[in-house]
Regions:
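N-terminal ligand-binding/catalytic initiation module
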Residues: 1-119, 123-125
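Glycine-rich adenosine-cofactor-binding loop
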Residues: 121-137
Length: 137
């Protein structure tokens, strides 16, 4: 049987991500990411988790963070270079790839710097809900 799948990779630039956040709203984006994080925690055992790989230098760190489930493989590349501000660059920059496990076909290549900040806020919300006393407001 022939598996004729079309090769189609979506690319999201930093401007594309900003446009989505502006259109949907920052609060809605954080809430949506928090919801997805909570759903993924419920299926934690389904993930093939690998330790992040880090490359340290005197100027900063570059990390590669891979993860997969039965259908998708993903990684995030993120750096932390505190002195970048001297050159007008962000101290943290990130991008990532989402690929089909069966074929290795990249489905998404995305700039993730803003998404990383949103995920950090969403994770804080998830943790606050999990640790809050019952009936807390």
């Amino acid at each position: 049987m022939s598996r004729n799948k079309r090769l189609s990779t979506v690319y999201l630039s930093a401007n594309d991500v900003i446009e989505v956040v502006n259109r949907v709203g920052l609060s809605a984006c954080i809430a949506g990411v928090a919801e997805r994080i909570e759903r993924d925690f419920l299926r934690w055992q389904e993930f093939d988790k690998s330790a992040r790989v880090a490359c340290h230098s005197p100027e900063g760190v570059i990390e590669l963070m891979p993860i997969a489930d039965a259908n998708e493989f993903s990684f995030k590349y993120v750096n932390g270079h505190p002195k970048n501000t001297h050159d007008g660059l962000p101290t943290v920059m990130a991008f990532g790839v989402l690929a089909d496990v069966d074929t290795g076909t990249p489905r998404l290549l995305s700039e993730l710097t803003l998404t990383t900040a949103i995920r950090t806020a969403a994770m804080s919300a998830v943790a606050a809900r999990a640790l809050a006393r019952p009936n807390a407001r």
